[in-house]
C-alpha cells in the first residue's frame, strides 16, 4: 500500500477510535440504555434522546463505511446499483420522501417508522454477520462493522422503546414490520449473484440508517428542544 493509502487508512482508524471513545464515555456503546432493565429505567427523556441520536449517527457512519468498502472491493464496474434501486425489503413502509416531508409528519408516526425500520433489520443483520464470516478473503473492516452494527441496532431499538414509553405512556408498538426474505440470495453458489445480493443489502442498510438518523434528530429537536434547534 502506498503512503497516501496508509495515511487515509490511519485517519479512518483514528476517527473510529475517537468516536468509539466518545460513545464509551457517554455510556452509549457496550452499556444498555437501561442497565437494570426496561421496567426500572431511571434515565431522563433528554438523556435517552441524546444517547439514541449518538447511536443512530454512529450506525449510519458504520453503514456508509461498510458499503463503501464492499463497493470498492467487489462491485467496481459490475452495475449492481441498477439492481439495488427500489428493491429494499423495507420499501413498503410509508416513509417521508425527504426531510421536509418528515418535518410535517406527526411525532407518533415518526417513532412508529423508526421502530418498524429497526425491527425489520434485526433478522437481516444477524444473517449478514453470519454470511460475511463465511466469505473468502472478506476484509476485516467489513466484518467488524457488520458485527458492531448488529449490536448497536439492538441497543437503539431498546432506547426507542424507552422513548416511546415516556413520550406516550402506556403505548405499545404493535404495528407489523417488513419481513426480510433475502437469505437464499446471500447463500447462492453463484458468486456474482451473491455479491449482488450483499451489495443490495448494504445499500438498503445505508439508506435506512440515514432515514432513522434523520427522523430521530427531528424528533429530538421537536420534543426536547421545542423545535428551537
Swiss-Prot record:
Residues 1-30 form the signal peptide. GO terms for cellular component: extracellular space. One of its GO terms (molecular function) is prolactin receptor binding. One of its GO terms (biological process) is positive regulation of lactation. Disulfide bonds join 34-41, 88-204, 221-229. The modification Phosphoserine is found at residues 56, 64, 120. PANTHER family: PROLACTIN, SOMATOTROPIN,PROLACTIN. Belongs to the somatotropin/prolactin family. Prolactin acts primarily on the mammary gland by promoting lactation. This is Prolactin. The gene is PRL.
Amino acid at each position: 500500500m502506498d503512503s497516501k493509502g496508509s495515511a487515509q487508512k490511519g485517519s479512518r482508524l483514528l476517527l473510529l477510535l475517537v468516536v468509539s471513545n466518545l460513545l464509551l464515555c457517554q455510556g452509549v456503546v457496550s452499556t444498555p440504555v437501561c442497565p437494570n432493565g426496561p421496567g426500572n429505567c431511571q434515565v431522563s427523556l433528554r438523556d435517552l434522546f441524546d444517547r439514541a441520536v449518538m447511536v443512530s449517527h454512529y450506525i449510519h457512519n458504520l453503514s456508509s463505511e461498510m458499503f463503501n468498502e464492499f463497493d470498492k472491493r467487489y462491485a467496481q464496474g459490475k452495475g449492481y446499483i441498477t439492481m439495488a434501486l427500489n428493491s429494499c425489503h423495507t420499501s413498503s413502509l410509508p416513509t417521508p420522501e425527504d426531510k421536509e416531508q418528515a418535518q410535517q409528519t406527526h411525532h407518533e408516526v415518526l417513532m412508529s417508522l423508526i421502530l418498524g425500520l429497526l425491527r425489520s433489520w434485526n433478522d437481516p443483520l444477524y444473517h449478514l454477520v453470519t454470511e460475511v464470516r463465511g466469505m473468502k478473503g472478506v476484509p476485516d473492516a467489513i466484518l467488524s462493522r457488520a458485527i458492531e452494527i448488529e449490536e448497536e441496532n439492538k441497543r437503539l431499538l431498546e432506547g426507542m422503546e424507552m422513548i416511546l414509553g415516556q413520550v406516550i405512556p402506556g403505548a405499545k408498538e404493535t404495528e407489523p414490520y417488513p419481513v426480510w426474505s433475502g437469505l437464499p440470495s446471500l447463500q447462492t453458489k453463484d458468486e456474482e449473484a451473491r455479491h449482488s445480493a450483499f451489495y443490495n443489502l448494504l445499500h438498503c442498510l445505508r439508506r435506512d440508517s440515514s432515514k432513522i438518523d434523520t427522523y430521530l434528530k427531528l424528533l429530538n429537536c421537536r420534543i426536547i428542544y421545542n423545535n428551537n434547534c
